[in-house]
Regions:
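Conserved helix-turn-beta segment immediately C-terminal to the redox Cys motif
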Residues: 43-45, 53, 57-82, 100-103
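N-terminal "domain-start" segment that seeds a small globular fold
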Residues: 17-38, 58, 122, 130
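Extracytoplasmic/secreted proteins, especially bacterial periplasmic and envelope-associated proteins
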Residues: 58, 62-65, 90, 94, ...
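Sec-dependent N-terminal signal peptides
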Residues: 3-14
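Thiol/selenol-based redox catalytic cores and closely related redox-interacting motifs
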Residues: 99-100, 104-137
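Thiol-based oxidoreductase modules, predominantly thioredoxin-like and allied folds used
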Residues: 73-90, 106-117
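Amphipathic alpha-helical repeat scaffolds
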Residues: 29, 49-53
């Protein structure tokens, strides 16, 4: 599995410079499967940094409610990251169990990534390089 993640990361790094759309990225899900964001063309996407030991952990319940109500047209993707105060120390399996057991999460979750720093995930590096980073439209 680590080998797959490593190869996937290298591929994303090498192709990142040529990407013009978020739909050109793939993510690795919390289950270790590759999910192409191109599958969500025509839908709105909401990317949410998540952490199981954060003061905002209850956001999972609200996100799940939104997913249940609008999931046909809106794709929610949770991106667990341990970049802020060590609030997501668990493994992918730990995170998945926590989210399912405590909040009934059924929206898409990525594997645990880094969203800042030297080891930033390629998708978030690309997002940060885009104009209109405030996402105000």
């Amino acid at each position: 599995m680590r080998y797959l993640v490593f190869i996937f990361s290298i591929f994303n790094f090498l192709t990142m410079a040529s990407q013009n759309s978020v739909h050109e990225f793939d993510i690795i899900t919390i289950d270790g499967k590759i999910q192409s964001l191109s599958a969500f063309k025509g839908k709105k996407m909401l990317f949410v940094n998540t952490a199981s030991q954060c003061g905002f952990t209850s956001q999972y319940k609200a996100l799940q409610n939104i997913h249940s109500k609008y999931g046909k047209d809106l794709v929610i993707i949770g991106f667990p990251a341990n970049n802020f105060g060590g609030q997501e120390p668990g493994s992918n399996s730990d995170i998945k169990t926590f989210c399912s057991k405590n909040y009934g999460v059924s929206f898409l979750m990525s594997n645990k990534i880094s969203i800042k720093g030297k080891d930033i995930d390629p998708l978030f590096k690309w997002l940060n390089s885009q104009k209109n980073q405030s996402f105000n439209g």
